[in-house]
Structures are given as C-alpha cells and as structure tokens.
Amino acid sequence: MSARAPKELRLALPPCLLNRTFASPNASGSGNTGARGPGAGGSGTCITQVGQQLFQSFSSTLVLIVLVTLIFCLIVLSLSTFHIHKRRMKKRKMQRAQEEYERDHCSGSRGGGGLPRPGRQAPTHAKETRLERQPRDSPICAPSNASSSSSSSPGLPCQGPCAPPPPPPASSPQGAHAVSSCLDTAGEGLLQTVVLS
C-alpha cells in the first residue's frame, strides 16, 4: 500500500509539485537556503500548472454534464410532443365520429318523413282481408243460388204437392255474414239484369 500511494500521487500531481515534494527531504538545514531562492520564483508557474490541470478536468466533466442534460431534454421533448400529437388525433377522431353520427341521424329523420306511417297502412290491409273473405264465402253462395234457380224455373211444373223448403240450420255468426254478403251480390245481379232489359 505504501508503494502504490506515491505512484498515485505522481499521476495526480503536476511535475513541478512532484519535484518540490521529492526535493524537499533531500535538502538540509541552512545549506538549503540558497536553493529556496530560485524555487520561490518557480512557485507561481507551479500554481498556474495546477490550475490549468484542474480547469481541464472540470471543463471535461462540465461538458459531459451538459451533453447528458441536452440528451435528456431531447428525450423529454420528443415524448411530450408524441403525447400531444396522440391527444390531438384522438380529439379529431371523436369529432369526425360525432359529425358522421349527426349526418346519419339527420338523413335518417329526413328520409323517414316521406315513408308512410304504419297507421296509414291499416285500411289497405282491411280491404285485402275483405277481398280474401269474398272468394272463401262464394262456395256457400253456390247452393243457395242453385236452390233459388231451381225454385224459380217456370218450365218445370211441380209434380204433386210441393214440399215446403226445409228450415235453415242454425248458422254461426260467420255463416250469417256470409249469407248476407251472398244475398247482396245476388240482389246486385238482379238489378243489373233489370236495367239491361
């Protein structure tokens, strides 16, 4: 350890200080007074050398610190600009989505005004049901028309006493409605034949 210490001191200290430190033990008492005279003049140059060495080391460390701070500031600026740009893009996307939704909603409301409402389609549906009921009721009208034609034919005399027509069976409300509709159609046909004749 004692041998390493002087080597480290030699590397750290400038040569003028090393010469003075190693020359001072060799000098003795009063005989060294003449040697101190020229050494006193060289002390100023030694101080300047020490100051220059310290300034060089300090300047190198200061340059390194400045470079590190600049790199850190650049990284922070890049991250902040990236986050700001990302927020702006999100806001633009939200605005575009709202505008598209408003346009679709307005166009749907305008287009829906021209379409017919469901309440207006009810009469047409009722008419269709009435038209569908008439062909269903037409087979019921056939036997009644046939019986009326056979009874009203004047060419065929009745042989013997004519039996009274059988009483109509008890009909349901639907059958009564069908018979009334058949009578209406038969009455219209008779009126047309009278007018034509």
UniProtKB/Swiss-Prot annotation:
Keyword list, A-Z: Glycoprotein, Membrane, Signal, Transmembrane, Transmembrane helix
Bias-annotated ranges (Basic and acidic residues): 96-107, 125-136
Residues bearing attached sugar chains per UniProt: N19, N26
Sequence ranges on the Extracellular membrane side: 24-61
GO cellular component, as recorded: membrane
Spans within the Cytoplasmic topological domain: 83-197
Keyword field contains Hydrolase: no
Biased composition (Pro residues): 162-171
TM region positions: 62-82
Topology in the lipid bilayer: Single-pass type I membrane protein
The protein's name: Uncharacterized protein C11orf87 homolog
Organism of derivation: Pongo abelii
